[in-house]
Regions:
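Conserved HGGG/HGGXW glycine-rich cap/lid loop of the alpha/beta-hydrolase fold
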Residues: 10-62
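Conserved alpha/beta-hydrolase "acid-adjacent" motif
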Residues: 235-241
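Catalytic active-site module of serine/aspartate enzymes centered on a nucleophile-bearing elbow/loop
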Residues: 251-300
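Gly/Ala-rich beta-loop-alpha elbow adjacent to hydrolase catalytic centers
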Residues: 95-99, 103
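Short beta-strand/loop motif that positions the catalytic acidic residue
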Residues: 222, 228-230
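Conserved alpha/beta-hydrolase catalytic His-Asp/Glu region
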Residues: 129, 150-204, 208-209, 213, ...
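Flexible "cap/lid" loop of the alpha/beta hydrolase fold
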Residues: 108, 117-155
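Active-site loop/oxyanion-hole signature of alpha/beta-hydrolase fold enzymes
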Residues: 51-94
Length: 300
């Protein structure tokens, strides 16, 4: 299994897909519970993809340390340390949900390392009024719901909006089967639901800003080109939140898909948008297709 040592105490577990120097890095709580993903699809489109597991989770080094409101800063710093260790200078960051939270922190902390950011169901949710006591104390992130519930692997059914597309239905069946297989594996509890892991409460990304006004101010400073991807039925990263974010970002394209929620499992479609976005950024420095002012001759 591939590991990268990023400091004296921490190894990050990662999965690698594709080859070449068009690097995509994604850091999530875990990647193993699903058989498909947007980033894996990108590896079919000529990208060299690294899927990192956040410190404290899964096969990465578990920790007893509580970073309080700084978990996402820690994850972002780990991404940079990983890139340095792998000899990667600039890269695309891609992430979904909490994984996209790492991207927002990278945009604010290390923008010079980013080519662009693929932000999948990325919010970010407003920090306004979110209690921080549980985060600061390191209380179990699942405690307010069900203290015996699995922490982070299975995606809730309400994330998936019903569809009549048989290919998507089959994809979801395969993913549930992969999740069940993972749960039945040897040492599952030790690896994925250790006491140290279950105590982690990261809170949402950018919670340290504390107010909606400060969040918007921070978003307005982001110069990194951002491709935002979302669904009309998402109850977490709602369309309203994503439109708010797009209005703040100076270099952003927002694509919202009808009939999808917090899981956009049309990965081929997302990759189509991402490839075009990336090529525009690389070729022109802008997120949109170059303007062509050549006169168009009509039929006379």
């Amino acid at each position: 299994m591939p590991y990268c040592r990023i400091d004296s105490d921490t190894e990050i577990y990662y999965m690698e897909y594709g080859s070449g120097d068009r690097y995509v890095i994604c850091s999530q709580i875990d990647h193993e519970y699903t058989a498909f993903s947007f980033e894996r699809e990108l590896s079919r489109r000529g990208f060299h993809v690294f899927l990192l597991t956040d410190r404290g989770f899964g096969r990465s080094t578990h920790t007893k340390e509580n970073y309080g409101l700084g978990w996402y800063d820690r994850f972002a710093d780990d991404v940079i340390a990983f890139a340095d260790a792998m000899g990667i200078d600039r890269f695309v960051y891609s992430g979904a949900s909490h994984g996209s939270g790492v991207g927002w922190h990278l945009c604010l902390r290390d923008p010079e390392r980013l080519i662009c950011f693929f932000a999948d169901v990325a919010g970010p949710i407003s920090p306004e009024g979110i209690p921080v006591e549980g985060i600061l104390s390191g209380n179990d992130v699942t405690a307010e719901n069900d203290p015996n519930a699995p922490a982070f692997c299975s995606l809730p059914d309400f994330f998936y909006i019903p569809t009549d597309d048989q290919a998507i239905i089959e994809r979801r069946r395969i993913c549930k089967e992969a999740d069940s297989t993972l749960r039945a594996s040897e040492n599952y509890k030790e690896i994925f639901e250790s006491d140290d892991t279950m105590r982690i409460n990261t809170g949402p990304a950018l919670i340290g800003l504390r107010t909606e006004e400060k969040l918007r101010e921070a978003l307005r400073t982001i110069e990194t080109p951002v491709l935002m991807l979302g669904g009309t039925e998402d109850v977490i990263s709602t369309p309203e939140l994503m439109i708010r974010t797009a209005k703040c970002l100076p270099h952003c394209k927002l694509v919202i898909h009808s009939g999808f929620g917090h899981v956009l499992d049309i990965y081929e479609e997302l990759a189509d948008d991402a490839v075009k976005f990336y090529e525009n950024v690389i070729n022109t420095g802008r997120y949109y297709t170059p303007v062509d002012n050549t006169p168009i001759e009509g039929i006379r």
